[in-house]
């Protein structure tokens, strides 16, 4: 386990990750978030902002659309990984980040990862 913690710490320092702020408000905010693996596989990775506000106990649906190979799957997994890393206690690949303590975007983290080869993730 110590080797995993050390690997996260070294990666955080080398890749300019930031300490996420865990909050009790139902808002997820990520400024200039990056996918930790995808950014290593391309010459230029465009960071993405994310804002999901679940206030007032209302159901929220966000629809993510775009052409094939435009990065939709990478974006969804990026947000899921940032939330997951924050809950692990790790720093995250972003400029700044606020993560609610109880949040899950429903993305399956166990899906295969052909995105690093420029392919979309097939539906499960």
Which residues fall in each region the model found?
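Flexible beta-alpha connector loops of hexameric P-loop NTPases
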Residues: 37-40, 65, 106-123
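Alpha-helical coupling/stalk and coiled-coil linker elements that connect catalytic or binding modules
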Residues: 1-70, 74-76, 80-104
């Amino acid at each position: 386990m110590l080797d995993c913690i050390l690997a996260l710490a070294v990666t955080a320092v080398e890749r300019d990750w930031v300490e996420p702020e865990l909050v009790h408000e139902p808002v997820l905010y990520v400024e200039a978030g990056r996918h930790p693996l995808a950014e290593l596989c391309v010459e230029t990775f465009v960071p993405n902002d994310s804002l999901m506000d679940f206030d007032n106990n209302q159901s929220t649906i966000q629809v993510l659309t775009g052409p094939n190979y435009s990065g939709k799957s990478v974006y969804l997994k990026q947000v899921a990984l940032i939330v997951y890393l924050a809950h692990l206690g790790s720093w995250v690949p972003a400029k700044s980040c606020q993560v609610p303590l109880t949040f899950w975007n429903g993305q399956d983290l166990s899906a295969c990862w052909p995105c690093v080869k420029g392919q979309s993730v097939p539906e499960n």
